[in-house]
């Protein structure tokens, strides 16, 4: 059975691409590749040529999710698994592969209608090292970009799809959330059963240093970026993080220090709470 190996890239549809470029570089510490002739902005965080593709759609939500597989045979096997499960699959065109800068990809909607791409052969730029404008380093490599958390209306059906068709493994549960891993990162995907106006609840990027999280936290507190949840430590992945609002209205989690999964010893559990401590919403402005 073929299985995805990492969260390779995320596509976001936004209404203000210039504001996103400022936020991504000056706050998150990602590197901009600039805005291309199609009006799309791509962002780096490691040796991959891009991890985020920002498109000026006005949607202010998730545009697509890109999951990586090892090679072309794995991609073809995955396409077969999807079709066998009743999912309509199309191959990426030459122009689409060129746009994503991959050797090959397939496209489909997951059971909740999330536009999803599975690809192989991303371009790696060791000759052009990632250079963060804020001197931030990120935990990626075999762990991929980070994670995304998606709102779904039917949790059981969607869990079965990502586990039984895409080959992900359940890490644990918290209330109405299911967490999945496809490499040592505790979760590359989480699903929350909830009716919400946006498909994307948040995405997460993990820094190599707690100092980077702390410095960014100070920047948010001292500036005009909305803080949605203060510093805290999660029960399941043990990450120390905080949440802030992006220019599109969904959140980004900025964290450090998550534990990893060893499948030879890992056991699925259900946590009673989401955080060991912290992650509290900010004090209401009226209390100031």
Task: Give the ranges of each region predicted by the language model.
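N-terminal beta-strand motif that seeds the catalytic metal site of vicinal oxygen chelate
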Residues: 1-18, 62-67, 123-156, 186, ...
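Core segments of cupin and vicinal oxygen chelate
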Residues: 2, 8-50, 150-187, 192
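Vicinal oxygen chelate
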Residues: 6-15, 57-141, 144-153, 178-179, 224-288, ...
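Short, structured motif recognition centered on aromatic/hydrophobic residues
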Residues: 6-10, 30, 43, 52-54, ...
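Conserved active-site tyrosine of GNAT-family acetyltransferases
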Residues: 20-25, 82, 113, 158, ...
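Conserved donor-binding loop and adjoining core beta-sheet/short helix segment
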Residues: 35-37, 45-70, 93-95
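Short, charged/polar, Gly/Pro-enriched secondary-structure boundary elements
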Residues: 48-53, 113-116, 186-190, 250-251
